[in-house]
């Protein structure tokens, strides 16, 4: 199961209880998604199974994420030996783009500010995931260069271009066409001049 659309029965900052086809689900979430009770919601799911052989126990936990990219980062994080699901959830309480930038740039100082992450874990995360995310951050920086060149060719001032670069949101996990980015930037610049 990749995602689930369900009716929210209960929600707080850590857990959502939902119902789908008369089956109840308790789903752990990284942050408060401000879900409304009795409304429908879509979460991307990951089922984590832990086995305790000395107690003959199999524990299943369901984790839910608002975006598919959060789910992918969670899976990448728990693939690291010393990072379990609780630590991965703590990491995902922060902005996903900031976390990805920190991993790609090996910003250990930022990562150790996260609860549950020590120097050793931060080094492991960067060493094992850096190669995966560095290209995404470089792509994001390339978009800014292309946007700047495109707006300059259209006759916008340097001040407008700098403003547009700070306002246009480019998701580092998603492929976006440069023409879409330029049109978003033009809208931002237009709104600025209207005010």
From Swiss-Prot:
GO terms of biological process kind: DNA recombination; DNA repair
Region entry Domain III, spans: 141-195
One Pfam family cited in the UniProt record for this chain: RuvA_C
Stretch list, region Domain I: 1-66
Keywords assigned: Cytoplasm, DNA damage, DNA recombination, DNA repair, DNA-binding
Record's subcellular location: Cytoplasm
Region of interest: Domain II: 67-141
Region described as Flexible linker: 141
A single Gene Ontology CC term: cytoplasm
GO MF term (any one): four-way junction DNA binding
Oligomeric and partner information: Homotetramer. Forms an RuvA(8)-RuvB(12)-Holliday junction (HJ) complex. HJ DNA is sandwiched between 2 RuvA tetramers; dsDNA enters through RuvA and exits via RuvB. An RuvB hexamer assembles on each DNA strand where it exits the tetramer. Each RuvB hexamer is contacted by two RuvA subunits (via domain III) on 2 adjacent RuvB subunits; this complex drives branch migration. In the full resolvosome a probable DNA-RuvA(4)-RuvB(12)-RuvC(2) complex forms which resolves the HJ.
Task performed by this protein: The RuvA-RuvB-RuvC complex processes Holliday junction (HJ) DNA during genetic recombination and DNA repair, while the RuvA-RuvB complex plays an important role in the rescue of blocked DNA replication forks via replication fork reversal (RFR). RuvA specifically binds to HJ cruciform DNA, conferring on it an open structure. The RuvB hexamer acts as an ATP-dependent pump, pulling dsDNA into and through the RuvAB complex. HJ branch migration allows RuvC to scan DNA until it finds its consensus sequence, where it cleaves and resolves the cruciform DNA.
Family: Belongs to the RuvA family.
Note on domains (UniProt): Has three domains with a flexible linker between the domains II and III and assumes an 'L' shape. Domain III is highly mobile and contacts RuvB.
Name of the protein: Holliday junction branch migration complex subunit RuvA
Species of the source: Ureaplasma parvum serovar 3 (strain ATCC 700970)
Gene: ruvA
